[in-house]
């Protein structure tokens, strides 16, 4: 299974779980738009900044989720812009979440920010 399909599967598992807990949400994907040119109309990707993998509402709060399909979740797995987006989301009063899905389907859903030490596996503090 490719990394992209593992990621898509992980995102769907997390979304389904959060919806079962009452969240109204969706997986954020690049949208296609219709563009017109001298030779007719055609579809092009509507490229915009993607804030995270899942966006939703839960208990009146905006939720942003970053999903990682990895066996060990360390600080460096998230890219700098992902840390920035999650931190800013949290600072503005939203709920920022990092979700880890292991290959066996075990899922960890953790609030962000965490007391993360770069290089440390944070899931040792959580039970599935």
Whereabouts are the PLM-identified features?
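Acidic-basic catalytic patches of nuclease active cores, encompassing PD-(D/E)XK
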Residues: 1-45
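Amphipathic coiled-coil/heptad-repeat helices and related helical stalk/stem segments
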Residues: 11, 50, 79-82
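Conserved catalytic cores of phosphodiester-cleaving nucleases, focusing on short active-site segments
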Residues: 18, 54-72
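Short connector loops at helix/strand junctions that flank enzyme active sites
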Residues: 47-51, 58-64, 91-93
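Mg2+/Mn2+-dependent nuclease catalytic core
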Residues: 71-91
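Nucleic-acid nuclease catalytic cores
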Residues: 87-115
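Intrinsically disordered, low-complexity terminal regions enriched in charged/polar residues
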Residues: 108-128
């Amino acid at each position: 299974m490719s990394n992209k399909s593992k990621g898509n599967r992980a995102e769907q598992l997390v979304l389904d779980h959060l919806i079962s807990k009452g969240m109204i949400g969706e997986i954020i994907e690049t949208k296609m738009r219709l563009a017109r040119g001298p030779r007719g109309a055609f579809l092009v990707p509507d490229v915009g900044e993607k804030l995270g993998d899942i966006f939703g509402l839960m208990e009146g709060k905006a939720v942003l989720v970053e999903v990682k399909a990895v066996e060990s979740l360390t600080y460096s797995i998230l890219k700098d812009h992902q840390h920035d987006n999650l931190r800013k989301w949290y600072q503005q009063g939203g709920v920022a979440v990092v979700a880890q899905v292991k290959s066996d389907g075990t899922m960890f859903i953790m609030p962000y920010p965490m007391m993360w030490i770069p290089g440390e596996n944070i899931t040792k503090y959580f039970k599935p």
